[in-house]
């Protein structure tokens, strides 16, 4: 039996250019996600000069601006960050679903790796837990995912 050919990415941000696209809504959570993402890039060899932060109003604005960023060819990867917290109306379900679908479509259309770090939680406490306390930092997790995807795609290409 022959040996398997395994292609894996590695967490090396050196020489890579990133856009961190983040919503302003629920900024007390999103700002922590941004900090986690920046810290992750720097810990893995990236530089501040290769990080561009773009802010938009809310989650519904993320897909279009993500597409525009993808089409510039200025970025090796884009990290999408936001926090959608359930309220008492079905608005949460529509926003969470459409924002997610929109960002996935951008990635498939433009071939730019996207790390999706948009929290969808039932409570503010759950969001805070996922932005750097008990449940880690999902901004950092999304950044690791995009780093790995970039390096896997480089090996495949």
From Swiss-Prot:
Active-site positions, per UniProt?
91
BP GO annotations: riboflavin biosynthetic process
> Quick one: which residues bind (2S)-2-hydroxy-3-oxobutyl phosphate?
88-89, 130
The similarity comment for this entry is: Belongs to the DMRL synthase family.
**UniProt pathway annotation:** Cofactor biosynthesis; riboflavin biosynthesis; riboflavin from 2-hydroxy-3-oxobutyl phosphate and 5-amino-6-(D-ribitylamino)uracil: step 1/2
Q: What class of enzyme is it?
A: transferase
Q: Which Gene3D superfamilies match?
A: Lumazine/riboflavin synthase
Could you say which residues form the signal peptide?
none
E.C. numbers: 2.5.1.78
Reactions that this protein is recorded to catalyse: (2S)-2-hydroxy-3-oxobutyl phosphate + 5-amino-6-(D-ribitylamino)uracil = 6,7-dimethyl-8-(1-D-ribityl)lumazine + phosphate + 2 H2O + H(+)
SUPFAM superfamilies attached to this UniProt entry:
Lumazine synthase
GO annotation, cellular component aspect: cytosol; riboflavin synthase complex
Mention any Pfam family matching this sequence.
DMRL_synthase
Query: Organism classification, top ranks?
Result: Bacteria, Pseudomonadati, Thermodesulfobacteriota, Desulfovibrionia, Desulfovibrionales
PANTHER family attached here?
A: 6,7-DIMETHYL-8-RIBITYLLUMAZINE SYNTHASE, 6,7-DIMETHYL-8-RIBITYLLUMAZINE SYNTHASE DMRL SYNTHASE LUMAZINE SYNTHASE
Q: Which domain of life is it from?
A: Bacteria
- Role played: Catalyzes the formation of 6,7-dimethyl-8-ribityllumazine by condensation of 5-amino-6-(D-ribitylamino)uracil with 3,4-dihydroxy-2-butanone 4-phosphate. This is the penultimate step in the biosynthesis of riboflavin.
Q: Which InterPro entries match?
A: LS, LS/RS, LS/RS_sf
Put simply, this protein is called 6,7-dimethyl-8-ribityllumazine synthase
Gene Ontology molecular function terms on file: 6,7-dimethyl-8-ribityllumazine synthase activity
Residues holding 5-amino-6-(D-ribitylamino)uracil = 25, 59-61, 83-85, 116
Q: Which UniProt keywords apply?
A: Riboflavin biosynthesis, Transferase
């Amino acid at each position: 039996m022959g040996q398997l050919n395994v292609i894996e990415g590695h967490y090396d941000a050196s020489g890579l250019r990133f856009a961190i696209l983040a919503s302003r809504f629920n900024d007390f959570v999103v700002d922590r996600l941004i900090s986690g993402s920046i810290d992750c890039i720097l810990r893995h060899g990236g530089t501040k000069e290769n990080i561009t932060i773009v802010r938009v109003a809310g989650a519904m604005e993320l897909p279009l601006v993500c597409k525009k960023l993808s089409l510039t060819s200025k970025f090796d990867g884009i990290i999408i960050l936001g926090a959608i917290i359930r309220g008492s109306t079905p608005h949460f379900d529509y926003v969470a679903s459409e924002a997610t679908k929109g960002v996935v479509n951008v990635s498939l259309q433009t071939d730019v790796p996207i790390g999706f770090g948009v929290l969808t939680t039932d409570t503010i406490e759950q969001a805070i837990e996922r932005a750097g306390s008990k449940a880690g930092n999902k901004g950092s997790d999304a950044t690791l995912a995009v780093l790995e995807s970039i390096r896997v795609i480089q090996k495949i290409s």
